[in-house]
C-alpha cells in the first residue's frame, strides 16, 4: 500500500518548496511476541512468558534512559516513531536505546509502526507534530492490545498528563514511570527515576524535602529568541564554557565575536552553566573587568568560597597561567601597566546547548531528616572538581557512602544552590585500584567493552598467512627480498586490507577512534587477533604492508618518493633498547647494525633540518611505572628514557606522514584529512618570555625548544583540507606546511582514513563515498560538531558512525594522564619521600616545581590555604621572583629546592599528592 507524504521546506537560497515522498505501508510486519498466533515468531525478541509488554513514549526514553538500561526494565516494544523522534532530539540517547534493541540479552523489540498499514496515522489539520506522534504511539499500543488479546497486558508508560488522559479514555492501560517502578517491588530502582519538573507532567504525591527557604539565587535564563537576537546585535557573545580545573569558581568562554576569552568569576555569574556548555555571555561594565595581576590562589577565590561553598577545595594551578586567579602585590617597572591590564569579564545569561552527562564521585550526607518512605537526601561530590555538587535522593544511602557511584544531572532550578540529579549505578569501593581505574575510563568516555561477535566475525580465521592471491595482486609489490626490520613501534602494516568500510569492525574502530594507553593496561581500537597475530611485524614472518619508499642522498635529501602496498618479511623485530644497544656496540658490523647506523645518521640530519626550520621539541616528561605482576600496584616510578633509537624512528615516521599528506592533498584537495598545529598567540607565550628574561635569556620564540611549557593551549587538531586555506594547514610544532597521520593505523582511526585516501590516490581502490562529502568529513574530524550538536543535518550521516577524531584523541590523552595520576597517588601513599625539584613558575603564594626524578609537576605553597599572605610575600615580575616583604627570603624561577612528597586527603575521598617545601 502506497501513501504520499508531503511537507514544505526552505532551500539555502531562501525559497519555499514542496516535497512529496512516497510512503509504503505493509501488513506483514511482525509484532515480536513469541506467544502471537498470527505473526511469524522465528525472529521474536520478547520473552515467551511475559505477562506485561511495555510501550514507552518518547519523553520517557529521553528522560529515563538510565532507568530503562536497568535489567529490571524488559519486554519493551520500541516504536519506530519514538526512534525517529529520539534521533532528532538526542543522538546520545538514541544510540543507547539502539544498543538495547540490538543486545542479545535484553528483550527489546523495534516495531515499525510508521510502515504498518494498521498503525500508521496521518497528521490531522491543525495537529502539531508532537500531538500527532503521541497519537501514533496510542494507536500502536491499541493495535498490540487487539493483536495479542487478553493473554498479555500492553502497558503504555508516559509522564505526559494529556497523553495519559487520552490513553485512559481510549481504553489503553497507562501508567507513569514512577507508579510502574513502584509496582515492581524493588525500592532501589526508584533512585533511578528522574523527577519531572514540568506542569504538563504527571507526578506522584512526593513531599518536597528541599529547604523551605526559597531564595532566588540565580538569574533567569534568557529565552532562545532573545539570545539569538542579542547575538545578532552583538549584545551577547556565544562560546563554550571552560571551568578552571583547579578553581571551580573561575571559568572562561572563548568568544570569536570579541576575539578574546571572557572570564566568568563565581557561581553566580556562571548562572548554572556546566563545564562544556555552549552559553550566551553578557559583558560586565568595564570597571568590573578582571585586572591582570600576579597569580595567586587567595583573596578573590576566598571570597567566593566564603560566599558560596566554604568547603570547596581550591588549588594552586600547575598548568597554564590563564588557569589561576590573580590577586597579589606586584613589584618591578611593569607593575603599573599590569594593574591597568584588564581582561573582559562577563556573566552567563543563557544556555544554548547543555553538556550534561553522567559523573563519577561519592556521596556527602546532608544534615536533613530522612523524609518519607526511607528517602534520604545527599550531596554528590564529583571527582571532577569542575562539577558542582549535585543534590540527589536515595533509598540506599547506607550502602552508598563508601562507594564510587555514577550520578546524572536532571535539572537546576534558579532557587537551588545545587543542581538536582539521580543515582545511576555503583562502580565499587572508594580507593580500590580497579574501581578508581574504571572511574578514569568513565570520566573520559573510554569504551572498554569486549569486542562483539559481529566485530570478531569480520576478522580472517587464524592462523593467517600471506596467500598466493596477495602475491599475485598487481597493486601489491613483493618486497620480501629487501632487508626489512622493525624497531618498536612497528612499521606501517596494511590494516585497511582487513578493515573494510561499512563493516561492524570498521564501525567499532570509528567509534573508539584510538587505542588508549593506561599505566597497567592498553585498550585497543582493533581486536587483538588483528593487531597481534595478523598485522604486527614479527621476525621472519611475511606480512602485508603499506610502504612509503624514498630514494635519499647521504645528506638526507629526498630524490624521489613512491607509495605501494607490499608484502614484506622482517629480518628482525627490535625494541628501542635492542636497537640502541646494537648501534652502540662497536664490535657489531653486520648488515642489520650497519643499516641501523646509516638510518640513524640520516635521521640526525633530518632532525637538524627540521630544527633549523623552526621545529620544536614539544614532548613533555613521560612517567614510567614498574608494576607488580600480581597485585598490579606500582613498585617504582621514574622518567621514561628517550634514546637515539626513539628519535630515529620518530624522524622517519614524521617524514612518512609529511609525504603522505602531500600525496593525498594533491589528489583530493577538498577532502583530505590532515593535522595542523596553529601558531600560538603572543599571549600564550608571554609567561615563557617573562621567565626567559628573568634569567637573562634573549629568547627567539619562533624556534626555542623551551616553548613546550607555554603551548598548553595550542593544540594540534585534525581538519578537512576543504575547510581552510593552505597557509592554515601549518603544523607549527613540526615547522611543516603539511602533515597528517598515516603510520599507526593499528591504534588510530585517523590513519585508517588516510590509508584509504592514499589507496584511492594510487588508484588501488575507490574513494569511499563518505570522503566525497566534505561537510560529512568535517563532522567526523571536528568533535564540537558531533558532541555539541545532536541535530546534525549532514548528507548520509546515518550511513556511518561518527568518529569524533579530535574528541577521542583528547580523551585518550586525558585518560592516560589520569591513570598516571592515580598510580602516582597509589605509589606515594606507601612511599612518602624527600627529593629535589626545580621551580618553573612563580605564584604570589608559592610556586610550581618540576621533580626531575619522577617527572612530576605540582604546586608548593608558601602561605596557608585561605591566607592571602597579607603582603608577607610579594612577586617581582621582572626577575620572576617571589620574596618576603622584608627581603629576608626569596625564591627564583629555575632555582633548585628540596621538597617532601606525600599523599594527603584534605577532603573526604579526594586524595592528592602534596608537595611541601623543606
Name each model feature, range by range.
Residues 1-217:
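Noncatalytic, typically N-terminal accessory segments of nucleic acid-processing enzymes
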Residues 62-64, 69-72, 83-88, 94, ...:
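Eukaryotic short linear interaction motifs
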Residues 384-386, 411-414, 429, 433, ...:
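Electropositive polyanion-binding surfaces
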